[in-house]
Design a protein with these regions (language model features):
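Hydrophobic alpha-helical interaction segments
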Residues: 4, 134-246
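Short beta-edge/loop segments at beta->alpha junctions of small alpha/beta modules
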Residues: 8-87, 107-109
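Short, charged/polar micro-motifs that form catalytic or ligand-binding hotspots
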Residues: 10, 29, 116, 167, ...
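Short, well-structured alpha-helical interface segments that form or flank functional binding sites
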Residues: 35-38, 121, 125, 172, ...
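Short, flexible beta-strand-to-coil junctions
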Residues: 53, 120, 186-188
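Short gly/ser-rich loop at a beta-strand->alpha-helix junction or flexible surface loop bordering the NTP-binding
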Residues: 55, 71-151
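Residues in well-ordered beta-strands of folded domains
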Residues: 58, 115-117, 157-159
Length: 246
């Protein structure tokens, strides 16, 4: 069995295990699931394919040059994480920073905001604790008017952490790029800070530079009731080719 031939016979750059099985059956007429599992493991081991989502793989040539997204936390954000971990070691929360979007936009955002999403039962407790440590810097579920009057550079915005919010693979308290993409459409406060005219550039730059797990992204988008809107925006306003249109 020629595993190179099986992979080359898959016409799509992004494919499922079923696509690989269909390719093998097309070439050899008989192929078992056990053989398929072995084949997939060898492709991954040799760097010929990369897993990009649940039952979704990409040929290595497509992903080559794309990195796993990560960014540097500001000292202020590090201190926020440290304080929450110390006061509430068992609470679920995620952090990311507005300035990270400057990597993807033409019009740089002038100030930084630290987004802190906390599991619902813990929002008020975390707000009280951080307000003592950072007086005047903490806002709990702020309205647009409150943001205008009370937010400062490096202000901390506390919102409810929605279930299934995808975290960074290396740190569960840092938001993943998939969460950030969805929040651009779901977080009303964030939407007042970033021009919708910059969204196409942001999304195209993210997808061209970094690996994006679409399954994870759209699962979270469904939790925010934004899946259809995000799909429509990407399809109508960008050159991004989504892996799955399901």
């Amino acid at each position: 069995m020629n595993k190179v031939a099986v992979l080359n016979n898959v016409k799509k750059d992004y494919f499922s295990r079923q696509d690989l099985l269909s390719s093998a059956l097309d070439l050899y007429g008989d192929y078992t699931n056990t053989q398929l599992r072995y084949l997939v493991s060898k492709y991954i081991e040799h760097g010929e394919i990369i897993r990009v989502g649940h039952n979704c793989y990409a040929k290595a040539k497509v992903i080559k040059g794309k990195k796993t997204y990560s960014n540097q936390l500001s000292e202020e954000a590090k201190e926020v994480i440290s304080q929450v971990e110390k006061a509430y070691p068992f609470i679920n929360f995620q952090v990311w920073e507005l300035r990270w979007l400057n990597d993807f936009v033409n019009h740089l955002l002038a100030r930084n905001i630290i987004f802190l999403d906390v599991e619902n039962d813990g929002c008020e407790f975390v707000y009280s604790s951080l307000s003592e440590k950072f007086p005047g810097k903490i806002l709990l579920r702020p309205t647009t008017k409150e943001m205008t009057y009370y937010s400062t550079d490096n202000a901390v915005l506390i919102e409810r952490l929605v279930s299934e919010s995808p975290a960074n693979s290396e740190n569960i308290h840092i938001a993943s790029i998939e969460k950030i993409i969805v929040d651009l459409f779901a977080n009303k406060t964030l939407m007042t800070m970033v021009s919708k005219g910059d969204y196409a550039d942001i999304l195209e730059n993210i997808f061209s530079k970094y690996q994006v797990d679409e399954k994870k992204m759209f699962r979270y988008a469904r939790r925010r009731n934004k899946e259809a809107e995000i799909r429509e925006y990407i399809n109508n306003n960008t050159d991004i080719k989504l892996i799955s249109e399901d």
